[in-house]
A protein has these predicted regions:
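Extracytosolic ligand-binding ectodomains
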Residues: 1-119
Length: 119
């Protein structure tokens, strides 16, 4: 996993979780079925929109160049100091990964760092 809504209290996390609860009936952060998919789509959509705005066009090369020059962005997954560069086209790293498990009542919960097995 690279994201869970559990324990997240950023403005973006509160806004997105509220929308999921309102529009999709999600009862709580542990019931977001694909928090990773939601977070990746949210962050990438916003980064791409910023790059298109910066480029002033949807031309592929110009958007790529603009993405490589984006400044800081407060996303769901993390605060991206510089999401992409000319030599790094992956905004996340191994430090963003954690393990999670489904409970018997179908909640997706992170496994605390340093634990060798789920609680």
């Amino acid at each position: 996993q690279t994201y869970s809504f559990i324990g997240q209290n950023t403005p973006a996390a509160r806004r997105v979780l509220s929308a999921l609860q309102r529009h999709w009936g999600v009862s709580g952060p542990e019931h977001v079925k694909s928090a990773v998919g939601v977070a990746h789509a949210y962050d990438l959509t916003h980064l791409l929109a910023r790059a298109i705005q910066k480029a002033g066009t949807t031309d592929r090369r110009k958007v790529r160049d603009a993405m490589e020059q984006l400044g800081p962005y407060d996303g769901l997954i993390q605060r991206y100091a510089q999401p992409f560069t000319a030599t790094r086209h992956e905004a996340l790293s191994a430090r963003n990964i954690f393990f999670a498990r489904y409970t018997a009542d179908d909640r997706l919960v992170p496994i605390p760092a340093g634990r060798s097995s789920p609680p």
